[in-house]
């Protein structure tokens, strides 16, 4: 067929134009399309058919369900049609029940409405009755008031009569006193002063016996008791009616003052005359008309007083009887005293209980403190009951004068009435209900004896109470308290607090002075103490212009400087700001002018005169001082002539008593002479200082003190202004040939790049010197310990070369007998425009080291081939500015190599350090190549700590450490755990120290190249960059990393946290706050974070500080200064713990940080936050618990209940059993309360049963009353009670006075607060207080604490004496006490208006801009490296 088709196609091709092949292809294409369309149609049709089938199935299912529902409905319909009656019955029953309930409710409502109407009627009737009673009471009150007014008029008339009688009695008394006395009687009339009563030491025995009076009994005991009762009764009803009447016979103006005296006596005689009448009637045995009238007046007065609601006067006078010389009794009024003189807190302890004489001679006055008169007798009854039931008043009466008034005659025992004086205000005073009321009716015996009441006091009080109750039964009813008063329980707490600021008598009686358990013993110093306190170097401070300025960083020896007498005149600079001292200037003798001394020099003897530094003996120095430019650095190579002589005033620290003395100094011929004044220059000098080559100068703290250190002594000197100080230092440096000032060489933070002994040759002169290259300056010293250089050489842009001395013939030249040939190698340093200096070096290693570092300092390292190959490549990178595409980065020397190091990568000055560098590389390899796992974590910790400690001990290896770690991480493949651990070790390094000079630049460039937040290595590089900046900002660390820091780096990814470390900060209320920090965080930054989280103020305002516990576990705490770094503190703490427990280190125990109050300022109390008040209350409670706060047993229970309410809230009443004893759970809570809030000394001698009774008493009378009181209210009340102690907020230190101290005590307390330093006895009674205005010098003196104070001996003449006090204490406590006093003094100095001006005027005033708390930071953690050679691993 195909053949036929071909033949046909061939036959017709020429005759036809149709292309059948294309036609066929087109048809086949159409066929394919048709097939596709047919397939699609079949597919769509199948889908449609499936959809229709599905619908059919669903329709069938719905039909079936509909049929089922139809069947169900049909069945229901059939059942409903079959039972219609049952449904109707159930509905009918429900209807009946609801109807019955409605009827019952209606009946109840009607019954209640009836009862309501009855109640309304009863209320209306009661209201009418009440109105009638109120009207009757109003009428009765009106009637009584009229009656009282009438009686008052009558009493005024009676007062006029009594006034006349008193005047008559005064005339009689004057007549008796003017008569000549016998010697026996004359001893009774010795004039006395209220400040020195006969009970005080020094009173004649005859006079002291007359005070006592119990010795002579002339009347019967019954009569005496009657007289005492009546006298006390009248005095008690008018507690403020003290003997204040003016003796008219003594005054020439009696006629003019008669009206005033009459008006005064009118008010006062109401409470005075009743006792007169009764006492005269019983004493004389007869009665006159005047006596009968007195009795009638007495009875009326009693009835009037017992029914009145207010006293008729606030100030009155009382009279009493004294035995006259004739044997009969004569009523003697007390003359009125002049206005009372305010008594400031004494500097010496005065007896507070001093009974006054029965009769005062003419010309003497007696000043008594005033008290508030009780409003009603029932108030007096309750006061008597309350004060008689409370503990006896003791030594807590700190700033008050307690007076005992004897009322009676020779035949009666004394009746004592304690009248409190007005205490001075101490900050925020809280007003309470008992303010001004008599606190006790007992005698307070001062001294070391225990307070005991007189035998008859209880009987007198009981008799007085019963007598008042019998006279007026209504007096037992308590009056309604006014609305403005505190709640009863709060008033009770304040009342107890007024008598409870003391140690209870039971506790004092059981202990002697020598064994008081509340005083801590001297603590021994442990390893952590030595680390944190720089080996306990106690500084010495002096008060200059009101500011505590450090004059020495070490304790002073006993006899340090000077030879003149210490009793000479003192400088008054320390009182110029804090106190208004007398500033008189007395010109010198006129003869001084004739001797050639200028008038300006003589007039400068004034305290604040500028010394005549312009009057130098050098005639060239005639330029005025204010035109001379002052600089802080000096050079011997100056063009002008050097000033080698000077005169002027300086302040000099005394030798025995460390006080400032103003002396006239003359510097001439290489020695210093000093005199008392310029007029004494013709006399023998008071002292002399020889200046030689071994002398040097050391600046003190601030800008006004310096030390002149000679071979034998150290002289402490101060100037009146910073400019004068700079002039003296300049001249002294010229004399001592010192060419550089102290700041650069004395800066311990700047580490020398290279140092060692070299022979310096210049201008043909050679000298063996100790050299140090610091930065770009080359310094040379006499010896290694010298702090001031002999000279300096600026190396920057200098030409440094090695001199070829192979042809020299003096190879055997030896230098200084030091055993090495210094002529082997020679270096020349040729600065621009200066002559060259030659350095002779002994060994090749030293030569290479000095050549490299000098070349780097000169800035020409790239052009010369010095240093190792690694250092040369870094120099080349520095020249090309470290471009990232430079081929130098991939040089084999800078990249990772599997082979170990054979030589150090940096230039090191000795063979030992080179060996140490190789061992350091091996240690790093062990750390890097061993995988960090839990079992081997301590292994890696030890490796890292040892390696980094070697770098801290030898700073020369720090550059080497960084070069090795960068080499180990650069171009290292593959990226495994070894690379990560190498970056972790680098992360530990950058937080501790940084490389120097161009190595630091290389580190920064390397970190920048690798910083990439997308990779793990890049994240570590970013973290290291942040650490480098933080280390540059806050300075380098002092201790190796702690275990906690290393574990945080190894186990936690530090790059995920901005603060990779965290530690809990504990508070006094047993709570804590977890705070984060990094490797460079200081305590100040750390506390800012704590304050933000807890809502507290800055430490400079609140007075809070951070403390650490002691690793030994002893009850010791160490205060951290703001400049300390948290990581250093933790590391030193762990190091001390390892030393205390060698071989068994507990990794679980960590340092405990506590945030609590260190300084307390009354002025800052107003802005206290709730959190601060809460923490302060818990801190005071801790002091109460430890026995550092005086509380009685009663007050201890009160404050314990307050703290229990704060800690546990309301006491659960359901927990109390019906009998009244607590259940076991409550009993356990009470034991916890007593354990946490009740003083330990009161629990020591208590048995278990006594503790249980104490807990029941706490619940029944104290804690249960506080129900509903919030924690903030309890804290407020607690602090109000605590602030009633005048020394609230003071820090107490246990000390032992040493001779020549006047304190004859074995142990005392030293209390430091914002007012000054107080010395307390073992009962915390103040013996003496030294305000900061009187403090001259304080700090360490040998092994003890020294305090030098200036006291005013004679107030009238203004004479001052200087006392030096020594106290034996533990060294850490001496340092803490010294820094605490300095902080308080400088706080007040900074708050004064002129303080800022003084700081700004200083040429070195930058140091004064530091915060107050930073001033003593250098005494805290700082490692001192004393190792001479390398410390091998």
Swiss-Prot record:
Residues 279-299 have a biased composition (Basic and acidic residues). Residues 643-737, 751-859 form the PH domain. Residues 1061-1392 form the FERM domain. Residues 247-346, 552-634 are annotated as: Disordered. Residues 332-343 have a biased composition (Pro residues). Pfam families: FERM_M (PF00373), MyTH4 (PF00784), PH (PF00169), RA_2 (PF21989). Residues 308-318, 568-578 have a biased composition (Low complexity). The keyword Coiled coil applies. The keyword Coiled coil applies. GO terms for biological process: blood vessel morphogenesis; branching involved in blood vessel morphogenesis. Residues 896-1050 form the MyTH4 domain. It comes from the Eukaryota. Residues 40-174 form a coiled coil. Keywords: Coiled coil, Developmental protein, Repeat. One of its GO terms (cellular component) is cytoskeleton. Residues 252-266, 597-606 have a biased composition (Polar residues). Residues 557-567 have a biased composition (Acidic residues). Critical component of the guidance pathway underlying endothelial cell migration and blood vessel patterning. Involved in mediating membrane localization of ephrin proteins, which have been shown to provide guidance cues for endothelial cell migration. This is Pleckstrin homology domain-containing family H member 1.
């Amino acid at each position: 067929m195909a053949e036929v088709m071909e033949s046909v196609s061939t036959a017709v091709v020429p005759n036809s134009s149709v292309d059948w092949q294309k036609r066929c292809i087109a048809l086949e294409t159409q066929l394919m399309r048709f097939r596709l369309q047919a397939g699609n149609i079949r597919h769509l049709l199948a889908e449609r058919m499936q959809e229709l089938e599905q619908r059919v199935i669903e329709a069938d299912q719905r039909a079936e369900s509909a049929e089922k529902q139809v069947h169900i409905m049909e069945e229901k319909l059939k059942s409903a049609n079959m039972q219609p009656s049952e449904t109707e019955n159930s509905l009918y029953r429900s209807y009946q029940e609801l109807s019955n309930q409605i009827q019952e409710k209606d009946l109840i409502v009607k019954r209640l409405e009836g009862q309501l109407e009855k109640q309304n009627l009863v209320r209306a009737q009661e209201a009418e009755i009440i109105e009638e009673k109120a009207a009757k009471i109003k009428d009765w009150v009106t009637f009584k008031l009229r009656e009282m007014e009438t009686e008052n008029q009558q009493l005024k008339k009676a007062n006029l009569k009594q006034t006349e009688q008193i005047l008559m009695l005064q005339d009689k008394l004057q007549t008796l006193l003017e008569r000549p006395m016998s010697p026996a009687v004359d001893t009774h009339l010795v004039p006395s002063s209220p400040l020195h009563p006969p009970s005080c030491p020094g009173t004649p025995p005859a006079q002291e016996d007359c005070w006592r009076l119990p010795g002579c009994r002339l009347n019967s005991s019954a009569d005496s008791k009657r007289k005492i009762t009546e006298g006390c009764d009248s005095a008690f009803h008018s507690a403020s009616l003290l003997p204040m009447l003016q003796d008219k016979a003594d005054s020439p103006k009696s006629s003019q003052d008669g009206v005033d005296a009459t008006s005064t006596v009118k008010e006062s005689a109401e409470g005075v005359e009743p006792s007169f009448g009764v006492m005269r009637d019983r004493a004389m045995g007869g009665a006159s008309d005047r006596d009968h009238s007195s009795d009638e007046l007495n009875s009326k007065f009693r009835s009037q007083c017992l029914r009145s609601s207010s006293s008729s006067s606030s100030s009155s006078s009382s009279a009493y009887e004294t035995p006259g010389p004739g044997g009969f009794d004569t009523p003697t009024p007390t003359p009125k005293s002049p206005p009372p003189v305010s008594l400031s807190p004494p500097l010496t302890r005065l007896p507070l209980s001093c009974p006054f004489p029965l009769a005062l001679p003419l010309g003497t006055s007696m000043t008594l403190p005033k008290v508030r008169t009780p409003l009603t007798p029932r108030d007096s009854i309750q006061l008597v009951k309350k004060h008689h039931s409370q503990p006896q008043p003791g030594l807590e009466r700190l700033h008050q004068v307690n007076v005992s008034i004897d009322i009676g005659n020779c035949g009666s025992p004394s009746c004592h009435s304690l009248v409190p004086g007005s205490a001075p205000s101490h900050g925020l005073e809280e007003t309470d209900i008992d303010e001004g009321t008599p606190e006790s009716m007992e005698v307070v015996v001062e001294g070391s004896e225990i307070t005991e009441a007189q035998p008859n006091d209880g009987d007198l009080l009981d008799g007085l109470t019963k007598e008042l109750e019998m006279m007026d039964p209504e007096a037992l009813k308590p009056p309604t308290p006014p609305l403005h008063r505190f709640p009863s329980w709060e008033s009770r707490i304040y009342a107890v607090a007024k008598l409870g600021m003391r140690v209870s008598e039971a506790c004092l009686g059981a202990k002697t002075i020598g064994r008081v358990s509340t005083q801590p013993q001297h603590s021994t110093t442990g390893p952590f103490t030595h680390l944190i306190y720089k080996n306990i170097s106690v500084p010495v401070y002096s008060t200059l212009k009101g500011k505590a300025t450090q004059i020495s960083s070490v304790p002073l020896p006993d006899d340090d400087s000077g030879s003149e007498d210490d009793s000479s005149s003192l400088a008054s600079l320390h009182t110029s700001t804090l106190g208004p001292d007398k500033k008189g200037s007395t010109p010198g003798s006129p003869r001084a002018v004739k001797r050639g001394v200028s008038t300006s020099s003589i007039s400068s003897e004034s305290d604040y005169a500028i010394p005549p530094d312009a009057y130098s003996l050098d005639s060239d120095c005639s330029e005025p001082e204010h035109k001379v430019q002052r600089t802080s650095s000096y050079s011997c190579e100056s063009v002008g002539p050097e000033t080698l002589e000077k005169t002027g005033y300086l302040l000099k620290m005394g030798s025995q008593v460390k006080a400032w003395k103003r002396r006239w100094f003359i510097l001439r011929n290489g020695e210093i002479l000093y005199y008392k004044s310029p007029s004494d220059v013709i006399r023998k000098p008071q002292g002399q200082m020889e200046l030689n080559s071994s002398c040097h100068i050391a600046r003190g703290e601030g800008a006004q003190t310096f030390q002149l250190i000679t071979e034998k002594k150290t002289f402490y000197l101060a100037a009146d202004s910073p400019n004068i100080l700079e002039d003296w230092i300049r001249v002294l440096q010229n004399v001592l040939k010192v060419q550089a000032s102290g700041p650069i060489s004395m800066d311990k933070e700047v580490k020398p790049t290279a140092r060692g002994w070299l022979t310096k040759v210049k201008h043909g002169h050679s000298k063996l010197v100790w050299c140090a290259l610091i930065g770009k300056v080359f310094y040379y010293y006499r010896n290694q310990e010298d702090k001031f250089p002999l000279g300096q050489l600026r190396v920057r842009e200098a030409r440094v070369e090695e001199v070829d001395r192979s042809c020299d013939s003096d190879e055997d030249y030896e230098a200084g007998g030091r055993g090495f040939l210094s002529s082997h190698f020679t270096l020349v340093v040729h600065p621009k425009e200066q002559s060259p200096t030659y350095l002779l070096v002994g060994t090749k290693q030293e030569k290479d080291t000095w050549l490299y570092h000098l070349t780097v300092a000169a800035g020409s390292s790239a052009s010369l081939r010095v240093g190792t190959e690694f250092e040369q490549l870094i120099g080349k990178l520095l020249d090309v500015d470290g471009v990232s595409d430079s081929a130098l980065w991939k040089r084999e020397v800078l990249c990772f190599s599997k082979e170990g190091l054979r030589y150090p990568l940096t230039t090191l000055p000795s063979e030992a350090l080179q060996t140490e560098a190789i061992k350091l590389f091996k240690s790093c390899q062990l750390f890097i190549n061993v995988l960090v796992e839990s079992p081997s974590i301590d292994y890696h910790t030890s490796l890292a700590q040892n390696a980094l400690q070697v770098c801290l001990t030898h700073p020369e290896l720090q550059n080497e450490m960084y070069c090795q770690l960068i080499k180990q991480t650069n171009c290292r493949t593959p990226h495994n755990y070894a690379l990560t651990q190498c970056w972790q070790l680098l992360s530990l390094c950058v937080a501790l120290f940084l490389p120097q000079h161009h190595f630091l630049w290389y580190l920064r460039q390397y970190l920048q190249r690798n910083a990439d937040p997308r990779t793990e290595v890049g994240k570590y590089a970013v973290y290291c960059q942040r650490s480098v900046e933080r280390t540059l900002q806050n300075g380098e660390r002092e201790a190796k990393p702690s275990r906690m820091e290393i574990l945080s780096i190894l186990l936690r990814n530090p790059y995920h946290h901005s603060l990779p470390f965290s530690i809990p900060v504990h508070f006094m209320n047993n709570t804590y706050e977890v705070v984060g920090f990094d490797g460079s965080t200081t305590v100040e930054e750390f506390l800012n974070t704590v304050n933000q989280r807890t809502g507290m103020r800055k430490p400079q305002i609140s007075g809070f500080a951070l403390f650490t516990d002691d690793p030994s576990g002893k009850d010791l705490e160490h205060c951290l200064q703001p400049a300390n770094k948290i990581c250093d503190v933790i590391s030193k703490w762990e190091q001390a713990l390892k030393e205390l427990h060698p071989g068994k280190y507990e990794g679980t125990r960590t340092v405990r940080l506590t945030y609590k109050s260190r300084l307390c300022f009354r002025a800052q109390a107003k802005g206290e936050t709730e959190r601060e008040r809460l923490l302060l209350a818990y801190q005071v409670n801790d002091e109460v618990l430890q026995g550092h706060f005086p509380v009685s047993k009663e007050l201890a229970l009160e404050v314990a209940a307050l703290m229990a309410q704060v800690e546990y809230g309301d006491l659960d009443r359901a927990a109390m059993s019906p009998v009244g004893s607590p259940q076991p759970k409550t009993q356990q809570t009470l034991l916890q309360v007593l354990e946490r809030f009740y003083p330990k000394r009161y629990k020591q001698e208590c048995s278990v049963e006594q503790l249980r009774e104490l807990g029941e008493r706490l619940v029944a009378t104290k804690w249960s009353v506080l129900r509903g009181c919030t924690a903030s209210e309890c804290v407020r009340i607690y602090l109000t009670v605590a602030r009633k102690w005048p020394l609230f907020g003071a820090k107490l230190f246990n000390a032992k006075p040493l001779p020549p101290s006047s304190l004859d005590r074995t142990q005392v307390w030293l209390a430091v607060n914002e007012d000054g330093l107080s010395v307390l006895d073992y009962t915390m009674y103040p013996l003496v207080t030294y305000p900061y205005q009187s403090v001259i010098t304080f700090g360490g003196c040998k092994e003890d604490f020294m305090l030098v104070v200036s006291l005013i001996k004679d107030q009238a003449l203004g004479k001052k004496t200087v006392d030096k006090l020594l106290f034996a204490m533990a060294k850490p406590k001496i340092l803490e006490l010294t820094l605490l006093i300095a902080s308080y003094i400088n706080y007040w100095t900074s708050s004064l208006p002129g303080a800022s001006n003084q700081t700004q005027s200083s040429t070195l005033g930058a140091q004064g801009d530091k915060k107050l708390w930073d001033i003593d930071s250098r005494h805290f953690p700082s490692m001192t490296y004393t190792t001479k050679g390398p410390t091998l691993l």
